[in-house]
C-alpha cells in the first residue's frame, strides 16, 4: 500500500512539472516571435484615404453704386421758354404769371428784396464753389423748402455706394479680419516593445500623407490669393472715377449759365411789359441760379467722395473674401490633419498589437 501511494504521488508530481514546463516553453516561444516590421495594412489604407474636404473660393461681395443725377424742372423750362417772347408780343404768358404768383405767395417781402438784390458777382462766386452769404442763404433755404417754389427748381439726387447715400463728408471705415490657426499636436505616446522598423514605416506613411495634405492646403491658399489679386486688379483707380467728373459738371454749369443769362436778358428786355412782376421774376431767376450752382457743387463733391468710398469698400470686400477663403482652407486642413494624427497613432499601436506577447 505504501508503495502504491508513493507511485501515485510521483505520477501527479511529474504531470504537474510537465504542465508547467509546457506553459513556460509556450510563453517563451511567443516571446521569441519576431515583431512586425510594417503596420497593419488596413490602418495604412485608413490613413491614406484621408483627404482635405473641398474648399470653394468665395468671391468678394459686390459693391453697388449709383451716380448722382440732376433732373431739370419742366415748369422752369416752360417759363424760360416763354420769357423770350414777352418783349416783342407785349403780353405775359399764363405760365409766367403763374410762376410769379407762386413765388410772391411763397416768399416773404423781405426775402424777396434780399434775393432780388443778389449781384452777378455773388452768383459767380457761388458757381466757383464759394459759400452763399448768410443772409442770402437764409432767404434761399426758406424759398427752396416751399413746394410752390420747388416746382421751378432742379432736383438733385446724391450718389450711393453699397446702398448708402454719399453726401461728400463720409469717413471711410476699415474692415479687419483675423484668421485663427488651430494648434495641432503631433505628440504620440511611446509604446513599449514595438518594432523600430514598424514605427519607422508607420511614420513614413504618415509623413507622406501629411506632405500631400500640406500640398492641398497650399493649392487652396494659392487659389484664395489668386482670387484676391484678380478682384483687386479689377477695382478701378480712384482717378479713373473722379477725372471724368470735371468735364461732366463743367457741362452742367455751362447749361445753367446759358439758361440764367438768357432768362435775365429776356426779363430785362421785357421789364416795361412785366411791371410789378419784374422783381419777382428776377428773384425767381436768382433763386434758380443760386440753387443750381450750389446743388451742382454739392453733388460733384459727393460723387468725388463716392469714388473713394466705392474703391475702399471694394478693396475691403476683396480682403474679407480672401481672409474667409484662407480660414476655410485652414479649417479643412486642420480637420484632415487631426484625423491623420489619430490614424498615425493607430498605425503605431498596430506595430505593438500584431506581434509578441504581453
Where are the model-predicted features located?
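A periodicity- and composition-biased signal for non-globular, repetitive helical segments
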Residues: 11-15, 36-37, 223, 259, ...
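C-terminal amphipathic alpha-helix
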Residues: 307, 312-358
Amino acid at each position: 500500500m505504501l508503495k502504491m501511494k508513493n507511485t501515485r504521488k510521483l505520477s501527479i508530481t511529474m504531470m504537474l512539472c510537465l504542465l508547467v514546463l509546457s506553459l513556460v516553453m509556450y510563453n517563451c516561444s511567443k516571446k521569441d516571435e519576431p515583431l512586425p516590421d510594417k503596420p497593419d495594412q488596413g490602418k495604412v489604407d485608413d490613413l491614406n484615404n484621408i483627404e482635405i474636404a473641398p474648399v470653394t473660393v468665395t468671391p468678394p461681395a459686390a459693391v453697388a453704386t449709383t451716380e448722382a443725377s440732376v433732373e431739370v424742372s419742366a415748369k422752369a423750362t416752360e417759363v424760360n421758354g416763354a420769357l423770350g417772347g414777352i418783349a416783342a408780343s407785349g403780353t405775359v404768358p399764363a405760365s409766367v404769371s403763374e410762376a410769379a404768383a407762386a413765388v410772391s405767395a411763397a416768399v416773404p417781402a423781405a426775402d424777396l428784396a434780399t434775393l432780388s438784390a443778389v449781384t452777378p458777382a455773388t452768383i459767380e462766386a457761388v458757381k466757383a464753389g464759394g459759400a452763399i452769404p448768410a443772409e442770402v442763404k437764409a432767404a434761399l433755404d426758406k424759398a427752396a423748402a416751399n413746394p410752390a417754389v420747388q416746382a421751378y427748381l432742379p432736383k438733385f439726387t446724391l450718389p450711393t455706394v453699397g446702398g448708402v447715400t454719399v453726401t461728400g463728408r463720409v469717413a471711410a471705415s476699415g474692415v479687419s479680419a483675423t484668421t485663427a490657426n488651430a494648434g495641432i499636436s503631433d505628440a504620440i505616446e511611446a509604446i513599449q516593445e514595438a518594432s523600430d522598423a514598424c514605427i519607422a514605416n508607420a511614420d513614413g506613411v504618415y509623413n507622406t500623407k501629411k506632405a500631400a495634405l500640406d500640398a492641398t492646403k497650399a493649392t487652396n491658399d494659392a487659389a484664395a490669393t489668386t482670387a484676391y489679386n484678380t478682384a483687386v486688379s479689377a477695382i478701378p483707380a480712384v482717378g479713373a472715377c473722379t477725372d471724368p467728373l470735371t468735364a461732366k459738371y463743367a457741362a452742367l454749369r455751362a447749361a445753367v449759365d446759358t439758361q440764367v443769362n438768357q432768362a435775365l436778358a429776356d426779363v430785362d428786355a421785357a421789364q416795361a411789359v412785366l411791371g410789378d412782376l419784374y422783381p419777382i421774376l428776377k428773384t425767381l431767376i436768382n433763386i434758380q441760379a443760386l440753387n443750381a450752382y450750389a446743388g451742382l457743387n454739392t453733388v460733384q463733391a459727393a460723387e468725388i467722395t463716392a469714388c473713394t468710398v466705392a474703391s475702399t469698400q471694394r478693396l475691403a470686400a476683396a480682403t474679407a473674401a480672401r481672409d474667409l477663403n484662407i480660414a476655410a482652407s485652414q479649417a479643412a486642413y486642420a480637420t484632415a490633419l487631426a484625423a491623420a494624427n489619430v490614424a498615425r497613432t493607430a498605425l503605431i499601436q498596430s506595430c505593438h498589437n500584431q506581434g509578441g506577447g504581453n
